[in-house]
């Protein structure tokens, strides 16, 4: 039997294992220290730290990326582009690296090089929205509008959160032409059209909103309907907001005061059509529908004051449509009980767009009084389309400016050339 001495082999294996372990420890230490330097370089915008990170770990694409990021921050775009190129050679399927390289090349006015980089980003992430979006924006800046919007539509198809931005771009490029914008957006279904309608409503383009709503294949939901009315109202397109809102049972009319005698107990909490709106900040005043006290009809509004009412904010308001350059008489009834106030209550009317005062009543009575009918005239502006009726206080001469007691309000009406609901 031949006996083989295995000891030298075992020793060699052990030495090799130790060497490999030492190498791996050293490599791990170098990579770890490189990553530490990378973090510091990004935090401090330190080029020396970024250079050393690349020196310690030249095969780490993150080190090259960090160096490029620091160089870009310092305006050294040419050097940054070279670092991004090195990173893409090490990790060529990273779409974000290609996007960063493309953006850097564009900073150098190398739009063709930027496009080549973004082509690679799309190649490696063809089903993601962000690559198509970036490429589409670059093509748009290059003046290649048709190609650009093809890419942008792909982005919006992949991720609908891009659709509002697509609509915004199309609106700007089309110079606010709805038909051109629709073509650029590529309206495919009711969801796309509703997104366009919301955008138009935000812009106060009520006529275009109503035109587009007529093209929907399915009835508009109540939620969407109410949202569009709110958007048009907020954009101060009162005429079209009203046209969209007005219930079919009502005949549209200027000067229409809704719920003028408070027969409907609903008080709205946010601005809109259809009744009286209570200002959110005036929540210390108690409002109640009273069936015992009324000027006419079956009910009135009882208002109980317990010490606080901000003169700068109306307690109640209602927006009504009006005709331009026209005089309207506004009448209303009030009754008071033990009403004590440092500044009198008044009824006012303001232009809904400019917030210009159009008219105001005499001071409302204080103390204890029976029902009193008051009236004042206001004249709308040449540009007026809507006005806001407000119940508020006059300015106080002192602070605090208390108010205590009870007032009733009833029969608020525009009495000439109007129809009240």
Task: Give residue ranges: language-model regions.
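Extracellular and organelle-lumenal recognition/adhesion modules and their flexible linkers in secreted
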Residues: 8-31, 35, 161, 165, ...
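Canonical positions in the second alpha-helix
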Residues: 52-53, 86-87, 120-121, 154-155, ...
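A structural motif in tetratricopeptide-repeat
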Residues: 56-60, 74, 91, 125-128, ...
């Amino acid at each position: 039997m031949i006996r083989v001495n295995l000891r030298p082999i075992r020793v060699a294996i052990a030495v090799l294992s130790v060497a490999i372990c030492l190498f791996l420890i050293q490599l791990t230490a170098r990579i770890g220290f490189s990553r530490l330097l990378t973090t510091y370089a990004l935090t401090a915008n330190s080029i020396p730290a970024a250079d050393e990170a690349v020196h310690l770990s030249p095969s780490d694409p993150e080190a090259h990326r960090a160096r490029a990021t620091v160089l870009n921050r310092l305006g050294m775009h040419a050097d940054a582009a070279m670092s991004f190129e090195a990173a893409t050679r090490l990790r060529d399927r990273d779409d974000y690296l290609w996007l960063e390289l493309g953006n850097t090349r564009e900073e150098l006015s190398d739009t063709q090089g930027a496009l080549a980089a973004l082509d690679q980003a799309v190649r490696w992430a063809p089903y993601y929205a962000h690559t198509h979006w970036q490429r589409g924006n670059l093509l748009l800046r290059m003046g290649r509008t048709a190609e650009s919007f093809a890419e942008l539509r792909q982005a919006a198809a992949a991720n609908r959160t891009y659709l509002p931005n697509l609509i915004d771009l199309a609106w700007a490029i089309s110079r606010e032409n709805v038909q051109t914008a629709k073509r650029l957006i590529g309206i495919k279904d009711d969801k796309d059209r509703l997104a366009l309608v919301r955008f138009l409503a935000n812009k106060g383009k009520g006529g275009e909103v109503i035109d587009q709503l007529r093209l929907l294949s399915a009835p508009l939901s109540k939620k969407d309907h109410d949202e569009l009315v709110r958007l048009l109202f907020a954009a101060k397109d009162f005429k079209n907001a009203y046209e969209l809102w007005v219930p079919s049972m009502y005949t549209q009319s200027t000067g229409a005061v809704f719920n003028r005698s408070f027969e409907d107990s609903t008080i709205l909490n946010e601005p809109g059509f259809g009744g009286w709106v209570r200002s959110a900040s005036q929540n210390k005043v108690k409002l109640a529908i009273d069936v015992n006290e009324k000027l006419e009809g079956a009910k009135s509004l009882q208002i109980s004051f317990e010490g606080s009412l901000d003169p700068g904010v109306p307690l109640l308001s209602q927006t009504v449509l009006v005709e331009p350059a026209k005089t309207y008489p506004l009448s209303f009834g009030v009754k008071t009980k033990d009403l004590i106030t440092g500044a009198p209550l008044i009824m006012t009317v303001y232009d809904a767009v400019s917030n210009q005062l159009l008219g105001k009543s005499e001071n409302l009575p204080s103390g204890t009084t029976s029902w009193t009918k008051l009236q004042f005239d206001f004249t709308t502006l040449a540009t007026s389309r809507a006005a806001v009726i407000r119940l508020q206080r006059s300015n106080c001469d002192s602070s605090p400016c208390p108010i205590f007691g009870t007032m009733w309000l009833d029969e608020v009406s525009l009495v000439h050339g109007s129809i009240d609901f």
